[in-house]
Amino acid sequence: MQQLTPMDAAFLYLENESTHAHGTLVWLYDASHCEDPGVNRRALLEHMRSRLHVSPIFTRKIHRLPLDFDYPYWVDDAGFELLYHVRELSLPQDGDWGDFCQLVSTVHSRPLDHNHPLWELTLVPKLNDIDGLPPQCFAILGKFHHVAIDGATGMQIIEAIHDAPGQQQAEALAPVRPARLPSLGESLFRAAIRNVGALDKGLELVGLGASPRPDNTEIAEAPLEEVTSDPHQEPSGIPQTLFNQAITPQATWESRSFDLARIKAMRQAVKGATVNDVLLTIVAGGLRHYLQHREALPDTPMKAGCPVNIRTEAEAAAGGNMISAIIINMHTDIADPLQRLQAITRSSSAAKQRAGARGSRKILDVVDVVPAQAQALLGNLVGKVAGKMNRAVQFNGSVSNLPGPQQELHMLGGRLQSIGAAMPVMNGYGLFVGLTTCAGELRISMSSSANILPDPGKLGDCMEHSFKELSSAARKRPATKRKSTKPGAAKSRPTRKKS
């Protein structure tokens, strides 16, 4: 039995009827090298039965205490049933990429049941006739609650449930033995001890405690405007966009793939640019084109909240969430793609420098000192207030670079070829762009809700247009002095079949 950390619990408390704190990973497999892949629900059940032991998240569930007077506990699920967690859905016989994206949206829209372990796998076989995908393609949708994993720990679990070349067969799972929950008196005592410790830490954070102030106080206390803006520009506000309004329970999702080698080559066009800067530039261009299409492009540049992993090596095995965020100016007001890349390179560098180690962990420190009952009340209040405000407060949308596998992975005989990500959105923050890499491919996935993004395919087209714009401009500009990467040929994206 393990108690949730304050940061993990926050993802539970933020949930409501329209906001669900889970992510859905979209794994696409190439089974064209197999004569009979044997891709069906029974095979997936057998495979997962042999991998349940790789992480406790597969067999434990959440136990919340009365009135949320302390943080919830992870407890073993004595009635665990694997059949509940492994499912299968199929596309229509003539289904295309748009139909597949709609299926992902539907699966992602359904909340996870807290009476069970917080994960599901959904098999989607026979994606054989979708342009741009292998002739023997299938997908697995892995839905996991954010209370259990973040991007870094999630990739560890993904690699553990897949097969890798030369990997030994996994050991069998030991029987589940439920742990005893603490009594009401024990829970009250633990909550009291925790709150006393949180009070001391809170006093320390505001400078009233006995502990010495850190050397990098200046960084930790840098106001948000300084962190989010260029060092040579006046801070600007957060524009209100069509993405910043109340969401509905029905999710929408779209994803497009690009050649990672070409993206790496684009950074040569601007001195100091990183791959992440190139990706942010492509995303910003896509958003600019889409908002122009909707006649809703703001004059003030949009801001993106970018999650960052802040766990140390010693904390790497702890699981759960240890994340913070930096906020970066996306410069959506700049039409020229190379000028936009230059501006984003400066902005991202300034944001990273100002958000030092202590500054990045400050969100985690603040969450740690808020008692469980207050967190639960605040989480409910935030959702209601944001739903009525219909406006952004800190940033316009999230852009997250999720780590990809470092080796070739297989499942049910298929080689993992591509990874997409459907991510959670909430009232006031109705856009989440996930960036994932796998097997030399970079995939840009866009998550929103149906009332905000009724035409996700159009936003996907705009991302492709932005990629082509930047690629063309980068080729015409002499490369800066750094080790070059030979551009590869652009990959074709899955497209809708013509009727």
Where are the model-predicted features located?
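Acidic, low-complexity proline/glycine-rich segments
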Residues: P6-S18
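Soluble acyl-CoA-dependent acyltransferase catalytic core bearing the H(X)4D motif
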Residues: M1-D8, V26-V39, L45-Y429, V433-E464, ...
